[in-house]
Amino acid sequence: DPGSSLTGWVLVDDDGAVLAHGKDPNEQLLAWYRESLVHDEETLDRGDLVVLEFMSPRGMSTSEHEFDALWWAGRLTEALEATGLVTIERVSREEVKFVLLGKHGVPQPDARIRSILIDRYAAGGGKEAAIGTKAHPGPLYGVKADEWAALAVACAWRDDARDIVQERAERAEKKRAEAERRSRKAAA
């Protein structure tokens, strides 16, 4: 979940277990990506997948804060690509909400998504089992703020978002091909 100065992130394994999480300065993450891909003893390995939340057009004005977040998302993506180790995908907040909530326009989507994530990791024991306490931490112990958004991205990707992103890419390719066809036809 890239932000204008801080980025919330989670590292999950193939089964969705949270291995590490944090909210770090963008410059620190950029250095991590460029230097070693090691963060607090957790490592990204060749073949791992990184999914970044990316903004999509909303038909509203955009703030400087949002432009800064987009700029950092691009810088982080470029640094990750330069490693040649990981595959990078992007998913929009709208796509995450649609996958996890099942529809658009749900009131208080962030609170509902957090509740869905807690239920997913609760193993039948409710919020206390999912989050836990300092003495008895659950799988989501310590997850806070933008880390929840990053976890939502990871869970949505594991569920269905990859299919939605693929459909988006196919629609964009069809539009590009149609525009190219019209351009050639107009030039003839």
For each feature predicted by the language model, list its residue ranges.
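Phosphate- and other anionic-substrate recognition elements at nucleic-acid/protein interfaces
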Residues: 2-188
